[in-house]
């Protein structure tokens, strides 16, 4: 009889090991006295997801319409074939996560401390920043934080609203894709002489990919720098910055799109960067589109559409600011290279101590409301003047049929397959300048999320 009674338990454990378990959390109608194993018996607290021993293939489902406050830390690991997944279920608004105080896990709502973890279809909001003091904590602030050593994680299809930092990742082989981030205007910390943040996505290490995200309104207007923050920042000099791929993102209203620091990190490490691809992004931001301080080796900016004519209340207004400190000169083949980009600018396409020597190939330059202004660069450029876009003032960056951008870009099909809208790029022949290739058919659905 005892042997027979153990058989169902053995089968349950075997089945769980093979296919993984499903757990359910409902903050409105659940109870922590339940087993959490069915939709009818959900837990109430999201802390149960931390206390249970998750195994490869397990899925934690959070009920739509639920709201959770405070931090949870997922320390277990999945596998490549059986990742552990945090997701939503039911109908209504995405389940909401916040952490209003830095005294609890530095203000993180969810911390990933294992490998092969997926976070999807969740909503993060109102994590702290404005009243934070001290520089050490800034290396940990974020609504969703991936710890160093937590590799092969995926963050997809989530919302981050008014989070001082949306996503901070110190894990390698991370994919951050198709998230919607709409930021605050307050700094993560502030003194009389300095401030820092806010940022949408903060990468602490290399071997990461950021793609198909919408990132909006991360930046201050009143910091000692004039403004600070931005869509994506790559720093924390403790770890290498090799192999980063940032592509097919839409950014708007941020204090810049990308910043890579040098000697500003805490602690003050100096970290050179290697093998980046920043391609097919559409960026309508204030401040500088690119603020590059770190020395570059094999860094490529390809087929981006950069509209830098609205300051969004911020004073700095160059497209690419290259103030590299130390390391190899940018203008060497081992440095930074701009190819096939559309620069729409109000002051200058490039600025900084190394900008004149940066490698530039087949870019188009258009000074806002001054279509006759000619770019006084070298003959390797595609040209300058009115790009003939469908409606620049309404942020419609599609090319008109008579656009001079058509057929002026070099073919990079050995590196890229799809334009900003996911349409196939020609395998042979010249491409069009910018992130959006000319097409008579409008895409049925944007790949970058809207809200």
Which residue ranges define each predicted feature?
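Acidic Gly/Asp/Thr-rich repetitive segments characteristic of extracellular carbohydrate-active
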Residues: 27-63, 67-68, 73, 403, ...
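Parallel beta-helix/beta-solenoid
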Residues: 55, 63, 76, 81, ...
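Right-handed parallel beta-helix/beta-spiral solenoid domain characteristic of secreted/periplasmic
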Residues: 61-63, 77-137, 383-387
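Surface-exposed loop/turn segments connecting beta-strands in extracellular beta-rich domains
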Residues: 70, 105, 122-128, 139, ...
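Predominantly extracellular beta-rich ligand-binding scaffolds that present long acidic/polar faces
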Residues: 70, 75, 105, 248-251, ...
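Extracellular beta-strand/beta-solenoid scaffold signature
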Residues: 99-111, 132-147, 161-165, 189-205, ...
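C-terminal accessory segments
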Residues: 379-440
């Amino acid at each position: 009889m005892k042997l027979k009674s153990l058989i169902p338990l053995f089968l349950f454990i075997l089945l769980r090991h093979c296919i993984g378990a499903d757990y359910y959390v409902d903050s409105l109608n659940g109870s922590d006295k339940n087993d959490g194993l069915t939709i009818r018996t959900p837990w109430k607290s999201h802390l149960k997801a931390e206390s249970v021993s998750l195994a490869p293939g397990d899925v934690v489902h959070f009920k739509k319409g639920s709201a959770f406050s405070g931090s949870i830390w997922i320390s277990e690991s999945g596998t490549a074939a059986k990742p552990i997944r945090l997701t939503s279920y039911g109908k209504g608004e995405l389940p909401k996560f916040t952490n209003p105080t830095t005294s609890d896990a530095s203000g993180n709502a969810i911390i990933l401390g294992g490998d092969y973890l997926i976070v999807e279809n969740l909503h993060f909001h109102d994590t702290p920043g404005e009243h934070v003091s001290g520089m050490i904590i800034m290396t940990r602030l974020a609504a969703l934080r991936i710890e160093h050593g937590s590799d092969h994680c995926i963050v997809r299809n989530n919302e981050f609203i008014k989070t001082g930092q949306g996503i901070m990742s110190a894990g390698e082989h991370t994919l951050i894709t198709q998230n919607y981030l709409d930021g605050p205007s307050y700094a993560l910390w502030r003194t009389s002489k300095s401030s820092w943040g806010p940022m949408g996505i903060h990468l602490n290490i290399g071997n990461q990919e950021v793609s198909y995200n919408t990132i909006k309104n991360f930046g201050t207007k009143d910091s000692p720098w004039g403004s600070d923050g931005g869509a994506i920042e790559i720093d924390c000099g403790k770890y290498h910055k090799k192999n980063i791929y940032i592509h097919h993102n839409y950014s708007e209203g941020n204090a810049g799109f990308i910043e890579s620091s040098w000697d500003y990190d805490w602690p003050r490490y100096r970290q050179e960067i290697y093998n980046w691809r920043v391609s097919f992004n559409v960026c309508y931001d204030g401040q500088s589109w690119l603020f590059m301080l770190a020395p570059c080796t094999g860094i490529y900016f390809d087929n981006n559409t950069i509209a830098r004519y609205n300051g969004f209340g911020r004073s700095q207004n160059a497209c690419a600011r290259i103030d590299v400190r130390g390391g190899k000169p940018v203008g060497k083949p081992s440095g930074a290279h701009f190819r096939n980009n559309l620069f729409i600018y109000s002051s200058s396409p490039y600025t900084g101590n190394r900008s004149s020597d940066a490698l530039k190939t087949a870019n188009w330059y258009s000074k806002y409301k001054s279509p006759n202004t000619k770019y006084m660069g070298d003959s390797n450029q595609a040209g300058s003047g009115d790009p003939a876009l469908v409606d620049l003032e309404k942020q419609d960056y599609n090319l008109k049929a008579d656009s001079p951008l058509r057929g002026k870009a070099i073919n990079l099909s050995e590196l890229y397959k799809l334009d900003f809208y996911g349409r196939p790029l020609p395998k042979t022949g010249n491409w069009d300048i910018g992130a959006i290739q000319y097409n008579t058919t409008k895409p049925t659905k944007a790949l970058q999320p809207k809200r």
